[in-house]
Curated annotation (Swiss-Prot):
It is found in: Secreted. Expressed in the antennal lobe (at protein level). The modification Arginine amide is found at residue 10. This is Tachykinin-related peptide 6.
Length: 10
């Protein structure tokens, strides 16, 4: 889940 949020932010 954290991976998706990190990519979305970038």
């Amino acid at each position: 889940a954290p991976s998706m949020g990190f990519m979305g932010m970038r």
